[in-house]
Design a protein with these regions (language model features):
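Accessory C-terminal segments flanking Radical SAM cores
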Residues: 1-45, 254, 258-330
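N-terminal [4Fe-4S]-dependent radical SAM core
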Residues: 34-107, 129
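Short, flexible, glycine/charge-rich loop motifs used to bind or transfer phosphoryl groups or to couple energy/partner
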Residues: 95-96, 152, 174
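Core AdoMet radical
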Residues: 104-117, 127-144, 156-197, 201-218, ...
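Conserved C-terminal portion of the radical SAM core fold
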Residues: 109, 134-138, 193-283, 289-296
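Alpha-helix N-cap and loop-to-helix initiation/capping positions
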Residues: 115, 119-122, 249
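Generic structural signal for hydrophobic
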Residues: 123-127, 153, 177-178, 201, ...
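Conserved nucleotide-cofactor-binding alpha/beta core module
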Residues: 147-148
């Protein structure tokens, strides 16, 4: 039923984007039940009041450039399975067990590194059982063979994955494998190879994004990156050496650009906006990021000891409970 409604919505967006999107936003606000949906549709109504809003261009590009099955699958997986069904499981689990659960997990994958796909798959399997259906995976290096990684995405068909590519060229065959994963968004780092990588992925109907690693809060640089972006979604990610005050300034700047758009790009400051979603779902925030060496990264730059290969996700969440990683959103 949900997928049929999404199919109809995609068709209508192709034919009459402005009218269909407004209709969806109005209906969504009227019938939304969950915390996240109410916030999302309130925002959508506000942003789409302007007939010349660049967000109409974004939606038109998405329906024109993206495989519709991929758009539907990824959209349902993150919009319903993660932010509605999964969010309900997370709230119930937090109430029962007394510690915070994030709505997503960040994992760094290095082929042949300590954090292997078997352990990643185990964390995902357990995460889904407590409501975590979205996963961010940073590739530290391009794998020689993409088969195992894409099989991981296929094996969790109703989860949503966001894959961050390093600055290395994709091969045609690699892009073919990635395009077969309907539950996947692929982001190319803004560096020397990203335009060619985005071209290959767009040719195959993938949902694409760009990500940019920043170390300062230069407003002109932020605007330039948004203006020059080749994708409808641009993710700003702070470098490890970026100062906290610069991160806050970038988060504020991105938030302002999003509410007063000039270009057909939706900008996101990854960690601050991740926390906004978590705050809506749980009323608190919790960040879980596992490095390729199996250490757990904390927001203050410190690390927990290396993740034991046999440690469960529940055990890890209990271990970080009370650390600076979790708490009220500010």
């Amino acid at each position: 039923m949900i997928e049929a409604a999404v199919d109809r919505g995609i068709r209508e967006m192709q034919e009459e984007p402005k009218r269909s999107v407004r209709k969806l936003a109005d209906l969504g606000r009227q019938f939304s039940r969950g915390r996240f949906q109410k916030n999302f549709f309130d925002l959508s109504q506000t942003l789409l009041q302007d007939d010349n809003s660049p967000y109409y261009t974004i939606l038109s590009r998405l329906t024109r450039e993206t495989n519709h099955e991929t758009l539907k699958k990824f959209g349902v997986n993150i919009g319903y399975t993660s932010w509605t069904y999964g969010a309900s499981l997370i709230r119930s689990y937090e109430k029962e067990h007394g510690y915070d659960v994030p709505w997503t997990v960040f994992m760094h994958y290095l082929p042949d590194g300590p954090l292997g796909l078997k352990q990643i798959g185990g964390l995902i399997e357990e995460g889904r059982s407590i409501g975590i259906y979205t996963y961010f995976i940073y590739l530290e290096e391009m794998p020689e063979d993409w088969t195992e990684l894409t099989e991981l995405f296929h094996s969790f068909d109703n989860s949503a994955f966001l894959l961050f590519l390093p600055d290395r060229e994709l091969e045609d065959g690699d892009a073919d494998l990635l395009s077969g994963c309907r539950n996947l968004l692929v982001s190319a780092e803004i560096a020397s190879c990203y335009r060619e990588n985005i071209r290959l992925l767009k040719q195959r109907g993938c949902i694409v994004a760009n990500h940019y690693y920043y170390y300062s809060s230069d407003p002109e640089e932020i605007t330039r990156q948004v203006k020059d972006c080749d994708s409808p979604l641009l993710l700003f990610i702070a470098r490890d050496d970026c100062m906290p005050e610069d991160r806050r300034r970038v988060a504020d700047a991105v938030y302002d650009i999003r509410y007063h758009p000039e270009f057909p790009v939706f900008p996101v400051e990854l960690h601050s906006d991740f926390r906004r979603v978590d705050q809506i779902i749980s009323g608190r925030t919790c960040l879980l990021e596992v490095e390729a060496n199996r250490k757990v990264s904390l927001p203050d730059g410190s690390f927990l000891s290396a993740l034991d290969p046999d440690m469960t996700l529940a055990g890890l969440l209990r271990k970080i409970s009370g650390q600076t990683v979790c708490g009220e959103y500010a």
